[in-house]
Amino acid sequence: MEARPISTDPITYLDKDGNQQVCTAYTVLTSETKESILNYDDKWYDLPAGWYVVEGGVTITPRLDTHGEVNLILTNGSHLTAEWGIDVKVGDTFTVYAQSTDEGTMGRLTACLPADFNLDRMVHYSVWPDSGMAGIGSSARWRAGNDGIRESEGTIVINGGNIRAKGQDNASAIGGTRAEDIEFRSTDRGEVYNRRQGGSITINGGVVRTEAFAMSVGNCTTVESVGIGTCQMGYGGSVTINGGTVIAEATCDAITTGYGGTITINGGDVTAIGGVNNFAEDLNRVIPGNGIGPYESGSVTINGGTVKASAKGNGFGIGGARIYNTGAMTVTINGGTIEAAANRNNAAIGDKGKGESGVTINDGVIHAVGKGSAAGIGSKGDIRITGGELTVSAEGSGAAIGGFADSYSERVNCKSITINGDVIQSISSKDGACIGGAAGGSVGSITISDAELPLLSAKKILIGWDADSPGGKLTIRNCRVASTDTLSVLTDGIRVGSNSELVIEESEIRLPHLRGIRVGGNGSIAVRDSDLHTYGIFMDETVHTITDAKTLKKLEITDSTVLTGDIIGARGEYSSVEEVVIRGSSIRLNEEYTYNYCTIGGGTKGSFGSIDIQNSQIHIPSPGLNTAIGNGHQAYFNRESRIRIANSQVFVGGAKFGPAIGAAYGSSRGQINILIENSTVTAKGGNLRSDTDYIPGIGKNSSGRASEIGKIQILNSTVESFRLEEKDGTNYVYDDLHTKELPGIPAE
């Protein structure tokens, strides 16, 4: 190509900081057009290193090919149309400047490749490709002597101008071609791969738009086209947005990077929509694509700006590893105003990476919505939230914060969730937890501390998970947790699955009617220095054989106040609680609940190992079919159990057909020993099955099936034990405990 004339008339432009600068040596671009790119022998328009200026309307049909550092100034009112785009390959830097920050005044650059080229596939790719070319960026280059080259990417800097770009299939609008290798060849030493490297894209100002690839015919789900960043399968690369207005729409990922690449947003007004279906043949097809985030591994960091990101199809609003999870993927938010949505699966903000992956939120005003099986904020790794103002919801089976289902409808469990401080302004979910697992999922650990959570709302679990999890732990410390949900069936409020630990410390928990605090089999519960209003605190597991029996290892309540409507312990066929420890606490039955049942120990079909109550106040006037303190109705166990009440005040009513303290009616086998010392105890036996029945306040039913009472010891205590005189009566009289003549119980 002949040398172009150089102009020396001073021309101004705005630099990356918006300051006016002057250029005094540049080339003014002029139009070069033909009806078709195929009419050119040389289909490339070389731009050697230097400065170029666009004045008025300029159209160039061949693909512009940068060499070295190429700077382009768009004067006010100008418009450069690069019909076949601008090639920026490795080693090249392409920088765009404008003269104004006003969108209506600043110069324009359009690099939208034709969508209707070679639809009949009559042009061989070696003549001119119909895929693999970016609007601005690297290409699949099929030139003589360079056949098979898929270029690594160069450096693109946009400081101003009104930029509009669209690439081909298998390419970016702004970025590069889609390929893992630049080239592949076989030699006598084996196969040789040359990995394709991503480039650097920086947007400091201007208005930048990318259009989603579209076809009038064909299967849209086979299209691999992205907006801004390294196209799929490249390595590394970066996108940095410091200012300006960015509107990125793409068939797949709207703003993206290669394996292990980075996306950083420090400012500007950014809108990113991935998974856009602009295909006339089938507008209902679901396309995979993230709003902001890579195909696989990498990082997204948002430090400021206004960001709106969504995945219309399968993908993350902000995040990545939507298909494979071959490496680490992280999302970090340190500031900004952010709206994110995932419309089908994955998460509005999240990841599915391997290794040191996760989501960290330190600040920012964030609205995140997960629809379908998506989470609001989700991760396969660690979620850590220590600052900001969050409004989060999940409208399907995903958790508001936690687990989700991926693009293949496979459940993704979160490794850990940490929330510190009053960061959540509003949170709700449908079938997943507000904080925890997706429906049927689990979490490795959850820690919520120093937080006054907003009113929680969900159809199922509020906090936690319901699936088995080896060694899972949920800790709530120095928090206030409340919900005003109106429920018609028993629903877990705070829940962990089997083999897990639940710890509540220095907290206030207010759960509505029918919401309880529950752990799965072989787990444990500890409540310390807390105030709880709950349906119950318990394990509820039913199995069909004793060999599969589930156990609550330990239930500890220390220095706490508990208002409950049901069990504190374990229930379910063949279930048991090994140890109940109550220290310095007040436990009362919530008499507002219609069922008014409460048991400390074994609930229905549940047994216990030991119950140790010290320095506490217990008020349970109506335990239903179970004892207030002891085992449950129809409990089966074959061991010796122990009840100890020391330095406490206890008022308990009797179970139906059973005592208040001891063995419930219908229980079988085993033996219970009872020790009361330094305490004041009032116990009333339950209703009689017949007028000949004898049901004491402490002990067992004299007729019918019940576990044995081994020994009752009363030391330095005031104990009043009553029984009803007749069936359905109201007149209580002292039973024979004080004479040591209770039926079926040996004297000391």
What are these regions (language model features)?
Residues M1-E2, E748:
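Accessible peptide chain termini
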Residues A3-N71, L474, N478-C479, S488-V489, ...:
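N-terminal domain-start segments of secreted/luminal proteins
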Residues D46-A49, R63-L72, D87-N170, I174-K312, ...:
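Surface-exposed loop/turn motifs in large extracellular/passenger domains
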Residues S78:
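Catalytic-site microenvironment of enzymes
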Residues A399, A433:
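Substrate-binding N-lobe of the ribokinase-like
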